[in-house]
From Swiss-Prot:
Gene3D superfamilies: Ribosomal protein S11. Keywords: Ribonucleoprotein, Ribosomal protein, RNA-binding, rRNA-binding. This is Small ribosomal subunit protein uS11. It comes from Chelativorans sp. (strain BNC1). The lineage of its organism: Bacteria, Pseudomonadati, Pseudomonadota, Alphaproteobacteria, Hyphomicrobiales. SUPFAM superfamilies: Translational machinery components.
Length: 129
């Protein structure tokens, strides 16, 4: 019995003019998600999804490539203006932000939403190099 060809679902174009870019930059990777005002994901990308593996995922260049890809996907849905929420301690924060600006978005606000504990869990041990 022959397998049925997998149907490719085309995403319908959502006409959304403004949204929120969530940039989560960890020590190992950078994830960018662009959502509408309610928090529904419109486009997402990460350094790992762009083909970077291992320690290359945590570089600023990988974050830039991921942000450019995510911006292109969001612009296909008609997005023009963004609020940016940056989270995490990673090295890809600024480069992802610059890439979103260079892609032609009007950035209305930049917020740092990195969670800071009020003496919560015990942190990781310090690295000795």
């Amino acid at each position: 019995m022959a397998k049925e060809a997998a149907r490719v679902r085309r995403r319908e174009r959502k006409n959304i003019s403004s949204g929120v870019a969530h940039v989560n930059s960890t020590f190992n990777n950078t994830m960018i998600t662009i959502t509408d005002a309610q928090g529904n994901a419109i486009a997402w990308s990460s350094a790992g999804a762009q083909g970077f593996k291992g320690s290359r995922k945590s570089t600023p260049f990988a974050a830039q490539v991921a942000a450019e890809d995510c911006a292109r996907k969001a612009q296909e849905h008609g997005m023009r203006t963004l609020e940016v929420e940056v989270s995490g301690p990673g090295s890809g924060r600024e480069s992802a932000l610059r890439a979103l600006q260079a892609a032609g978005f009007t950035i209305t606000s930049i917020r740092d939403v990195t969670p800071i504990p009020h003496n919560g869990c015990r942190p990781r041990k310090k690295r000795r190099v």
